[in-house]
From Swiss-Prot:
Organism, as annotated: Mus musculus (Mouse)
Chief subcellular location: nucleus
Gene Ontology, cellular component aspect: cytosol; nucleoplasm; nucleus
Span list, region Disordered: 1-24, 54-103
Subcellular location(s) of the protein: Nucleus
N6-acetyllysine carried by residues: 160
DNA-binding region positions on the chain: 94-153
Family, per entry: Belongs to the paired homeobox family.
Role played: Master transcription factor of stromal fibroblasts for myofibroblastic lineage progression. Orchestrates the functional drift of fibroblasts into myofibroblastic phenotype via TGF-beta signaling by remodeling a super-enhancer landscape. Through this function, plays an essential role in wound healing process. Acts as a transcriptional regulator of muscle creatine kinase (MCK) and so has a role in the establishment of diverse mesodermal muscle types. The protein binds to an A/T-rich element in the muscle creatine enhancer.
Record-given protein name: Paired mesoderm homeobox protein 1
């Protein structure tokens, strides 16, 4: 026992000397430092890789979310529903509630419109109380009725102008049409000349002129001789009348 215990005690200083030696301390310290630094480096590297992976995943997710065509399926229907709801709300706000008038209300409104197209506030309020409507509804009805009245007036004026233009154009065309004269009856001589040749017509005309010229000369000579005889007889009669002393 003592020998074994002494051997153990002897080995302990030897081990202690080995551990306490400078070379062994440096080796152990180097191993320790190496292992810690290595672990730290691995941990830091793992943390950096994980961080980079998280950043890449986050950027990819953000790009996918920000892209208009690659939105998430859970968000797209919700956004579409929100947009539709907002548009429906806007349409509901813009849409006005139409008022339906009964026959008695329309008769009363038309009766007042025949009197005046622009009733004042007192008339509108009184009429609204009578027909069980608000003054704003009565005012809107008169605005719409005036617009309808103006449209009807413009349509009537356009139809009247169109009819006047049509009648005027018809009168102008009737005046501008020339009156065709009736064909005058043609004499037989003209027809005979038209049928005969020009040479024969000229020969006939010259022959008639030649035949008529001696007769005309004789007649003129006879008339001159008659005038001379009458003058002589008149002078003789004056000479034979006795003069009174």
């Amino acid at each position: 026992m003592t020998s074994s215990y002494g051997h153990v005690l002897e080995r302990q200083p030897a081990l202690g000397g080995r551990l306490d030696s400078p070379g062994n301390l440096d080796t152990l310290q180097a191993k320790k430092n190496f292992s810690v630094s290595h672990l730290l480096d691995l941990e830091e590297a793992g943390d950096m890789v994980a961080a980079q992976a998280d950043e890449s995943v986050g950027e990819a997710g953000r790009s996918l979310l920000e892209s208009p065509g690659l939105t998430s399926g859970s968000d797209t229907p919700q956004q579409d529903n929100d947009q539709l709801n907002s548009e429906e709300k806007k349409k509901r706000k813009q849409r006005r509630n139409r008022t339906t008038f009964n026959s008695s209300q329309l008769q009363a409104l038309e009766r007042v419109f025949e009197r005046t197209h622009y009733p004042d506030a007192f008339v509108r309020e009184d009429l609204a109380r009578r027909v069980n409507l608000t003054e704003a509804r009565v005012q809107v009805w008169f605005q719409n009725r005036r617009a309808k009245f103006r449209r009807n007036e413009r349509a009537m004026l356009a139809n009247k102008n169109a009819s006047l233009l049509k009648s005027y154009s018809g009168d102008v065309t009737a005046v501008e049409q020339p009156i065709v004269p009736r064909p005058a009856p043609r004499p037989t001589d003209y027809l005979s000349w038209g049928t005969a040749s020009p040479y024969s017509a000229m020969a006939t005309y010259s022959a008639t002129c030649a035949n008529n010229s001696p007769a005309q000369g004789i007649n003129m000579a006879n008339s001159i001789a008659n005038l001379r005889l009458k003058a002589k007889e008149y002078s003789l009669q004056r000479n034979q009348v006795p003069t009174v002393n």
